[in-house]
A protein has these predicted regions:
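Short active-site neighborhood of thiol/selenol oxidoreductases, capturing the structured segment around
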Residues: 34-62
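Short loop/turn microsegments at loop-to-beta-strand junctions
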Residues: 18-19, 41, 147-149
């Protein structure tokens, strides 16, 4: 993927106030960040979609370590641009039991500054591999994805205390790195 300097998102930085959001998870339950933060810290994951083997590997490892994350006083929430029918495929592949949220219109992703436009050449390459990003994400003219990112948001204060943000989608924060950052 080719990104110009102007198009490159930077993500939010440590000590930034985490933008509140309200969305529906795969179980039809409303998740509101500020309500979750009353009782626990939040590990917020942005992932590209069920078609991405790197995302699936990360989400599966997080599911396998979910109890350890909970023991550290945190809840895990994952955000994707993919529509609910594709989220069900993510669940099949990863066994994820934590909230997976379809970010309709990418409002959450934009608030966290992780969104970028996918160039036409890349969209075409994915389409040739039977991955229709526009259809999966409910997008019409342009296709957008998130930079895979992890934010740890502090309980009560709601500030970002850890971030992992890397344009190289093959590189992800390890579960151990996330656990080490949870107090």
């Amino acid at each position: 993927m080719i990104l110009s300097a102007q198009e490159k998102p930077e993500g939010l930085f440590i000590n930034s106030k985490a933008p509140d959001f309200k969305a529906i998870d795969q179980y039809g339950k409303e998740i509101r960040l500020k309500d979750v933060l009353k009782d626990s810290a939040v590990v917020l994951i942005f992932y590209r979609g069920q078609w991405c083997p790197y995302c699936n590997k990360q989400l599966k490892k997080l599911e396998d370590s979910l109890q350890l994350i909970k023991e550290k006083g945190a809840r895990l929430i994952a955000i994707t641009p993919e529509k609910p029918e594709y989220i069900s495929k993510t669940i099949e592949k990863t066994k994820a039991s934590y909230p997976l949220i379809y970010d309709k219109d990418m409002k959450i992703m934009k608030a966290y500054a992780v969104t970028f436009e996918v160039d036409e050449r890349t969209v075409s390459r994915y389409k040739n591999a039977d991955i229709d990003l526009a259809a999966a994400n409910g997008q019409k003219e342009k296709v957008y994805l998130p930079v895979p990112a992890v934010y740890i948001i502090s309980k009560k204060e709601g500030t970002i205390v850890y971030r992992y943000f890397n344009f190289d989608y093959k590189k992800r924060a390890s579960v151990q790195e996330i656990l080490d950052q949870l107090k």
